[in-house]
């Protein structure tokens, strides 16, 4: 095992920290570009066409971030202020997107408990639906949102059968289904199922190009042609219309072509790291829950040495991780982490938690 006598930097804060590869930089430098607001950037059009085909949807649109992609999607489906969206209480849209659906869109979030596996209980979702024929004191439900993989639950993959059932429930009540698929490629690789099958029941999907596959910037949202037409208006309204975005889309195309195949290796390294951490006497990892590239490490409940202090000690030896809770640390693997890095991280954790 590598010992932490020689400090190296291993950045496990997120899979968004990756640096553009040489092939990405070359593609960016040589990208064919035009004005995307006018709808003429050929590289953007190529990326959008390819992602739409991968997801099995009619059309797609590049957006600067996943937060904007989710916000636009919710606002297209909930086109009347005061509409309601049902989503997980531990979902990214609910916790990490500044409440944009309510503050900017006037959409009311109605949360349902996320189970440990990332799902929401079907009966609980149905019980949360509020009809336009119901009590006039309540907002009207228009949309259900799922997240796949579910990050706060540890990068868990939602089963296809479950997504299909939620889709059936949405149709039964005249609702739309949006999937925050920031790490949908991780789910696809882990489940061994094409993306288009996973999102078959969804009316729209937001797919991150940075998380998982390591492009430097952006997300793509997919849906029907009608959905994307409305989404373009909202993107412009929110300031997300950009000009020669082919420079960014070129890197994303490289990520799609080169890095999806690396995700399986990311998942294997995550499993090795999780098992190694779980063997350290004072640490606990639910290894069975490590399905993709995210690990949560529970540390001893020492009021003088919580996750904040542990992360600082790890940073001092070059290991960059994030406190998830008072006594929990989050680790995210990506394609620029090597086997040697994994060994080094294990040795650093062992040294810190045995000292």
Curated annotation (Swiss-Prot):
Disruption phenotype: Lethal albino phenotype when homozygous. The modification N6-(pyridoxal phosphate)lysine is found at residue 211. Pathway: Amino-acid degradation; L-threonine degradation via aldolase pathway; acetaldehyde and glycine from L-threonine: step 1/1. One of its GO terms (molecular function) is threonine aldolase activity. It is an enzyme of class 4 (lyase). Pfam families: Beta_elim_lyase. One of its GO terms (biological process) is threonine catabolic process. It catalyses: L-threonine = acetaldehyde + glycine; L-allo-threonine = acetaldehyde + glycine. It comes from the Eukaryota. Expressed in roots, leaf vasculature and flowers. GO terms for cellular component: cytosol. Disulfide bonds: none annotated. InterPro entries: ArAA_b-elim_lyase/Thr_aldolase, Low_specificity_L-TA-like, PyrdxlP-dep_Trfase, PyrdxlP-dep_Trfase_major, PyrdxlP-dep_Trfase_small. Its cofactor is pyridoxal 5'-phosphate. Keywords: Lyase, Pyridoxal phosphate. Its EC number is 4.1.2.48. Threonine aldolase involved in threonine degradation to glycine. May play a role in the removal of L-allo-threonine. Belongs to the threonine aldolase family. This is Probable low-specificity L-threonine aldolase 2. It comes from Arabidopsis thaliana.
């Amino acid at each position: 095992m590598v010992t932490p006598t020689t400090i190296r930097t291993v950045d496990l804060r997120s899979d968004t920290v990756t640096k553009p590869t040489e092939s990405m930089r070359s593609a960016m430098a040589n990208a064919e570009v035009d004005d995307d607001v006018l709808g003429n950037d050929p590289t953007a059009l190529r990326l959008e066409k390819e992602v739409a085909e991968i997801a099995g949807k009619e059309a797609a649109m590049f957006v600067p971030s996943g937060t904007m992609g989710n916000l636009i999607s919710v606002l297209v489906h909930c086109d009347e202020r005061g509409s309601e969206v049902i989503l997980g209480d531990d979902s990214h849209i609910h916790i990490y997107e500044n409440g944009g659906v309510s503050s900017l869109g006037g959409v009311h979030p109605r949360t349902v408990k996320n189970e440990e596996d990332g799902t929401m209980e079907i009966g609980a979702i149905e019980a949360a639906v509020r009809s336009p024929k119901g009590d006039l004191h309540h907002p009207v439900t228009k949309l259900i949102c799922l997240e796949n993989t579910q990050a706060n639950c540890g990068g868990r993959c939602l089963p296809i059968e479950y997504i299909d059932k939620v889709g059936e429930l949405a149709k039964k009540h005249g609702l739309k289904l949006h999937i925050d698929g920031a790490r949908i490629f991780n789910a696809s690789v882990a489940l061994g199922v094409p993306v288009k099958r996973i999102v078959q029941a969804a009316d729209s999907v937001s797919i991150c190009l940075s998380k998982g596959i390591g492009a430097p910037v952006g997300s793509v949202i997919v849906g029907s042609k009608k959905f994307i037409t409305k989404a373009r208006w909202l993107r412009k309204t929110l300031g997300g219309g950009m000009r020669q975005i082919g420079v960014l889309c070129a890197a994303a195309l490289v990520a799609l072509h080169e890095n999806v195949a690396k995700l399986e290796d990311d998942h294997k390294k995550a499993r090795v790291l999780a098992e190694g951490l779980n063997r350290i006497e004072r640490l606990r990892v639910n290894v069975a829950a490590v399905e993709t590239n995210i690990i949560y490490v529970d540390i001893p409940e020492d009021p003088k040495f919580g996750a904040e202090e542990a992360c600082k000690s790890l940073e001092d030896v070059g290991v960059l991780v994030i406190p998830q809770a008072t006594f929990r640390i989050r680790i995210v693997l990506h394609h620029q982490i090597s086997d040697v890095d994994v060994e080094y991280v294990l040795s650093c954790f062992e040294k810190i938690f045995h000292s």
